[in-house]
Amino acid sequence: MRVIVFVKATDDSEKGILPTTELLEAMGKFNEELINAGIMRVGDGLKPSSQGKRIAFDGPGRTVIDGPFAETRELVAGFWLWEVKDMDEAVAWVKRCPNPMPGPSEIEIRPLYEMADFQ
């Protein structure tokens, strides 16, 4: 099964505060483990929402909304796309992950729809 793994944003990540060298090294090693295990398909960090835009759809209308976006808890600071046997395997890998932020942080795992889900 494929899952997307979201690293949730924090006040620091929204301020553009970059990870420490130690954290970058630890995450690099973790990513290497994921790749060597055949789990990781892609992954990257995101710049703060102040550098992003949202497009709001309402029927035929489109409205562009400039960042930053208010609800930091709902924002994403990074992501991975993984191929795992099941959700339990994804959870086990996330538990091995270095804390992605200084201080409290949160990682969310969401399964992707597969073609079989639509049949």
Where are these regions (language model features)?
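Conserved, structured core segments of small domains
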Residues: M1-Q119
